[in-house]
Each structure stands twice: as C-alpha cells, then as structure tokens.
Regions:
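Short, glycine/charged-enriched hinge/interface segments at domain edges or termini
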Residues: 1-152, 293, 309
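Flexible glycine/proline-rich
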Residues: 13, 34, 73, 194-330
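Helix-rich terminal scaffold detector
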Residues: 103-228, 232-238
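Predominant activation on well-ordered alpha-helical scaffold segments within soluble catalytic domains
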Residues: 44-45, 77-80, 91-95, 137-140, ...
Length: 330
C-alpha cells in the first residue's frame, strides 16, 4: 500500500485551508470542495481509514470520483427560455442556479358552465330522465392540468334567465369561459340564443370537424366564450383543439399547443370522413392503437387509457393497419 499524511479534514460546506503536497492527503466528505494540489479522490473503502497516516490499497486514475465545477452548467449559459411551463424539474434547475424569483405569466382564470336540465351532480340519486354531469369535472380538471385556474364551476338548467345570470357572473371573474351543451338546434339548446341576446359577438358558430361540429366561439364583454358540445367525447375533442390552443396562447407556451404529429395505425378504421374526424387512440413510439368499438361521441369510458386524438382527414375512408395518420397527444 501507499502511505499518505492526512493534513486536513473537509466536511461539506467547509472550504479547504491546506494545499495538498506530494505524499499528502485530506479526508473529504461528499459535497466538500477538493483542495488545491489534489488530483484524485480515493474511496475510503480502499483505505485503512487511518487518521494521521492513511494507507491506500488500490491504484487510482487522475480525477477519479470528481464532480467537476461547471459540469451541470457554465456561467452565462441559458438554462430556461421564455414560454416554458415551470414544472418541478425546471423550478429545481432555477434554484440550482441561485434564482429565488422567476417572472411568470399569471394563471388564466377559466369559468366552466355545463348546461342541461337533465344533468345531476355525481353522488346524488338519479331521477328518471337524468344523467350524471361528467363534462363539468372532465373539462375543469383538464383546464387545471393545462395550468389554468378554474374560478367557477356551474351546472345550469335550461332556463334562459338563469343561463344569462351565470354567464354574466363568469364574464366578471374569468379570462375565459367554457360552456358545454345547448349549441345544437333543439328547442332547449339555448346557449347561442342567450349569448346573442346578451350582445356577445359571434366569432364562429360551427366547425367542419366531427364530433362536435356545432361548436361555437363568442366574445362576451371581451371575454372569449367557447361553446362546446354537450357530448363528453365531442367536448373533449374541442377542449384539446380550441380551448387548449387558447390557453397555450395565453401563456405563450408552445409546449402546451396541440401540435399535430404523424404515426401509423395498428388497427383498421372503416368509417368515412365527410369532414375532418377525430377519434380516440393510444400512441406509443408513433404507433397508434384504436379502441375496439365504443366510438360514439357520447361515450367516455373507451377514453380510459387513450393518450391521443387521431385525425381522419376529410375524404379518407376504410383506413387499414399500417396507414399513416396525424394525431395530437393529450
């Protein structure tokens, strides 16, 4: 073995006072700075644990077990850019550079209103003709996942004056309003009618996309109102295509935007597309599996496990396994 004189003991947070000369060593703990003059670190398991004199039993290479200064990032290096969503990792990166404050965009405040006298709150007993209000919770939670703040959640009866009151309240407290239901042509489909009566400006009132083609966008007292379909999957599609895009624009965050990607089908799809159609799917490595059956726009259960919306372009029909398609990750 090689014998070295121990001239200093260094714990994390303590700066070295000695310069290590030939035949000398310092006992050092993980996280402590390496003293000048040293050129390698020996694991204590390879020594006799000596205090004044230490015996080294295994040869070392220069700079073994070093954590070089600047290996994570260098002075002046750009670590985070404008438009990124601050998650746990990015907050940790900022903290590791000594940043205690970061300029961020305030959370977008969103009001969610589901319309329909048939809607019942989960946990209550259904009366004849009622269904549970899944869209209120689905849309609200998705907005939170995208970084929004849900400032109001209301289920509204199919009564014009009640709906007007809820919309006025929402416009006063929210930057963005999302409604579901009441956008088709039924006698009790009141959302468009009520918004028009309130003087809301119509941006568009239909989209050439299925499901959810009656989807509309209004501006009420300068607050955008996305009026989505009452069918849960149709509402999900336009939550991703339109509302998500609006939230991404609010934050200036390209990561949140619903960008199209290209992949390959692992299963067949036999329906034709008169307009662009979006269907649910599960993507892995650019390969997309479609759920077996249960594709109607009112069905939500087959979305369990799905992580993308697959775009079937207008005019395409009878897609076969292996064909290329566009998709949006959820």
């Amino acid at each position: 073995p090689v014998c070295l004189k121990v001239v200093e003991k260094l714990c994390a947070g303590k700066y070295p006072k000695q310069v290590i000369g030939s035949g000398e060593a310092a006992r050092i703990m993980t996280g402590a700075p390496i003293p000048n003059g040293a050129d390698t670190v020996v694991k204590q398991e390879d020594t006799d644990y000596g205090e004044g004199i230490v015996q080294i039993y295994r040869s070392q290479n220069p700079y073994d077990h070093y954590c070089p200064q600047g290996e994570d990032f260098l002075a002046g290096e750009k670590l985070l850019t404008k438009g990124l969503r601050m998650d746990a990792i990015r907050i940790g990166i900022a903290a590791s550079a000594g940043c205690d404050r970061i300029r961020v965009v305030k959370k977008v405040r969103v009001a969610v209103l589901t319309t329909g006298s048939e809607l019942a709150k989960p946990g209550t007993k259904l009366r004849p003709g009622q269904i549970y209000d899944s869209s209120l919770y689905l849309i609200s939670e998705r907005i939170r996942e995208l970084g929004g703040e849900v400032v109001r959640m209301n289920s509204v009866l199919d009564e014009p004056e009640i709906l007007k009151g809820r919309l006025r309240e929402a416009a006063r407290c929210a930057d963005l309003i999302v409604t579901t239901g009441g956008v088709s042509v039924g006698e009790k489909d009141l959302t468009r009618q009520v918004l028009s009566q309130m003087g809301a400006d119509k941006v568009f009132d239909r989209v050439f996309v299925k499901p959810g083609s009656p989807t509309a966008l209004f501006r009420l007292e300068e607050t955008p109102v996305f009026a989505l379909s009452g069918n849960p999957f149709a509402a999900t599609v336009h939550m991703e295509l339109l509302v998500r895009a609006a939230i991404a624009r609010w934050y200036g965050c390209d990561e949140l935007f619903p960008h199209e990607k290209r992949g390959f089908l692992l299963s067949n799809f036999g329906k034709s597309a008169v307009s662009d159609r979006y269907i649910r799917g599960t993507e892995s490595g650019g390969r997309i599996l479609l759920p077996n059956g249960k594709e109607r726009s009112g069905i939500l259960s087959s979305m369990n496990g799905c992580n993308c919306l697959v775009k079937i372009e207008q005019g395409r029909a009878n897609l076969r396994e292996g064909e290329r398609v566009c998709y949006i990750k959820i």
